[in-house]
Every structure is written in structure tokens, then in C-alpha cells.
Amino acid sequence: EHKTKPTQHSVKELQGMGVSPNIVVLRCDEPLEESIFKKISMFCNVKPDCVIENITLPFLYEAPLMLERENFSSIVCRELGIDAPAPELGEWRQMVESIKNRTGEVNIGLVGKYVQLHDAYLSVNEALNHAGYALNTCVHIHWIDSEGLTEADYKEKLSGLDGILVPGGFGGRGIAGMILAARYARENDLPYFGICLGMQVAVIEYARNVAGITKADSGEFDELCPDKVIDFMPGQSENIDK
């Protein structure tokens, strides 16, 4: 059973601060009963059609279409006194339908040190998905903790991937696993995308295993490294602690 009291209380608090909403948007997981709209309209002092239902959707980009079905844009324009034409959502609707009906699939391993918190790589996640939208492909992201990759098991853990992405990060934790991921991609001819730190570990891997510079490393991880293939720019290291 849906409760209206929390919404009523929130609106009352706003009104107590001098803010009287013209429109109330109700977030919900399931369709609301008509009585809910009537209660919110009555007790929150908003017009009946200004109580808008915003149901949880499986796909975020359907939200504008759903809100338009609720006449949200015309109601907003009316409340603001704006005379505007109806939005043209034809191309958006086509985009949503094409995304929902993608035919291709690809498996990308995202190898990082913060994978327990996916939001740490939110921009990378969304970029991969958008690339898939443009190419009619579902991108399946496999979150792989670089600290969990070892010489004994990295091949097994990275098998079955179509590509590997190593994103940015700081510090030496998990670097060994990232280097193994770069090595696996190179030796198995897999597409490899290194962003910032990810590109640095690719350079280190190549230097060690192809160029024969066995002690190659980054000055960020080992200040005393005799063969720094990555290092801070002059003056940059002085600002690291800051």
C-alpha cells in the first residue's frame, strides 16, 4: 500500500520555508492508485493534473517518453506561462527502440582497483554503454579486481573477454594485476584501452616483457627504480602530497 504522508510532510516543510510547489512528481516502482493523486493534490495544494507519476523504468532513456505521456512538458509550460510547441521526440523514440533491440554482444573486462564500488568508474561504464548504443551492441562489463589477478590465475580470469579496459587510478595498489591484464591483452591480440594509469601500466608491461627492461616501473610506484619508463614531470612530484 502506498503512503502519502511522507510526501505531504515534505511539501509542508517546503511551504514552511516559503516554497510552494506547483508540480509534485511522485517516484514509485509500481503504478499508483487514483486515490493517491487526489490525496496529494488536496493536501499539498496543487492542481490535480500537476501530480505526476514517475515509475521506475528498466531503461533510463525511456524517462522523457514516460513523462511526456503524463503531459509533463505542457504542464510545466502552462505553470510558467510559456507558450511553446509540443516537443518533437520522434528521433528520441527511435533511439530508445533501437537501443532496446540491439543485436550484437561484446564482453569487456574492466580491470581496476575500485571495482567493488561501480560508481567509481561511472563515466567509463556509461561511455562503454553509449559506444554500444551507437554500434547496435550490448556491452557486458565484467568487473575484475586487479588485486585478485596473479600469475597463477590471470589467464583463467581474463579468458572469454573481447577486450580489456584499465581505467585511471593512483598509487601502487593493484598495479601488478593491471600489468598482467595488459600482458594478457597483448599476448592474445585483444583490444586494450588504457586510460591514464591504464596506459602507463601498458608501457611498463611492454618494457618489461618485450623490450627486456625487466626492472621497468613508474616513479609513482617506486621512486628508486633504476629504469623509470614513467615518471613525474619536473616540479610535479612536489605537489603530490597536496
Spans of model-derived segments:
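N-terminal beta1-alpha1 cap of cysteine-dependent amidohydrolase-like domains
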Residues: 1-242
